[in-house]
Swiss-Prot record:
Together with the chaperonin GroEL, plays an essential role in assisting protein folding. The GroEL-GroES system forms a nano-cage that allows encapsulation of the non-native substrate proteins and provides a physical environment optimized to promote and accelerate protein folding. GroES binds to the apical surface of the GroEL ring, thereby capping the opening of the GroEL channel. It comes from Blochmanniella pennsylvanica (strain BPEN). SMART domains: Cpn10. Heptamer of 7 subunits arranged in a ring. Interacts with the chaperonin GroEL. This is Co-chaperonin GroES. The keyword Magnesium does not apply. Keywords: Chaperone, Cytoplasm. Gene3D superfamilies: GroES chaperonin. The gene is groES. Pfam families: Cpn10 (PF00166). SUPFAM superfamilies: GroES-like.
């Protein structure tokens, strides 16, 4: 896949997770909901500051992140693979390994 996000944008591939109900029943499809975790595939150069400088992003390629799946997150298909394009500010946390 050849895609380069601009500025503070990040390309994330959603990680599918198995969901279980409180009773231990495995939920699939729409009942399970969409995961808000993903792997960072590409990052932009950084956020442009008011003084013209650039602040590097905190996330790196390969990081597993938890993100806010809402307004501002763009879903695209690239090479038949669904990816999310979001600002770094839409990322809530980096999952430490």
């Amino acid at each position: 896949m050849k895609i380069r996000p601009l500025h503070d944008r990040v390309i994330v591939k959603r990680k599918e997770v198995e969901s279980k109900s409180a009773g231990g029943i495995v939920l699939t499809g729409s009942a399970a909901g969409k995961s808000t975790r993903g792997e960072v595939l590409a990052v932009g150069h950084g956020r442009v500051l008011e003084n013209g400088g650039v602040k590097a992003l905190d996330v790196r390629i390969g990081d597993t992140v938890i993100f806010n799946d809402g307004y501002g997150v763009k879903v695209e298909k690239i090479d038949n693979e669904e990816v999310l394009i979001m600002s770094e500010s839409d990322i809530l946390a980096i999952v430490e390994k």
